[in-house]
Amino acid sequence: RSKYELGTGELKSSEIYFEKPEIFLELARFISKERLPLLVELVDKKYCVATSIVNHHIMPPYYMPDESDGRAQYIRNGLADYLTANLPDGVYRSFFKACKQPTEENLLSSMSELKSFFEGEKQKLDFAELTVKSIDETIDDYRIMKSRIGERAAIEKFVPLPDLTARGVKVNLLPHVHSIFNLIARLNKYHLKNISDVTLFHDKQKDFDHILMQCKEYLETTEVSENIPPVVNSDFDLNESLSLEFVDSEDCVGVQVADLLAGFFNRYVNGLLYKEVDVNEIYHSIFSEFRRNFRPMSPLGVNFVIPASKQQIIFRKFNF
């Protein structure tokens, strides 16, 4: 703090990133030199929503063949990539409405608008016609399920289920959920399933603590299906339970440092890949320093939950 005149308050990435980036460079060099384990989930929220649309309206898993070879997931990722870049806001709003008010009318309207979008893409998109057929099949699947298990239960198969806060408030499409799932699974792989002595510290989340704890307990009690796409950097099959503690970030320097790191990766990738601004060379040097300890198939490093088209830009730049 004295070296960089930071004062005694809580460390804030939003201030340090632009005003004193050399702090990140020193931090990156220290982490690299000491070979400290670094696990980051870098999430494009719009891409997560697009992925949910694909999973529920285009390629729901209910009648899919064996997915363990990863081919179906590869197709899903490609569709989500395209939707992120091209789907009109109105179609997103229709999907949100179906999530918040899951009625048959809203569900079918959401699917219909998505189908209309791809029908309009047939002249320029080689997979548009197949996607339209997939949506038609999803609508048929819904009607079949409705006849078997009833309308309400069937609707819930084709929209993402909301998470519930401790007060019973519904929260739709919370990105924290997939991030905590992935982090725990990555820690499980890194520690070779021996995680009973591992404690994961998280800054207090007034509305989301309960949800994150529920996610942890779900992973610990749910048997992993063999019919899932391969995930090389994670192990979702937990034999032991880790501890998850929520702390006040003002009183925990470790959580503040984690926030600094998360803020760096978020701002760097946002500037480089999304805003496409002229990024100062020091930021490239910082990322390159972190990159030194990233290994293929390792649970350590950055998990880029962003469109593949964006991934490839940074992968080529830093030789992933």
Model-derived features with residue positions:
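Phosphate-ester processing/binding pockets and catalytic centers
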Residues: R1-F320
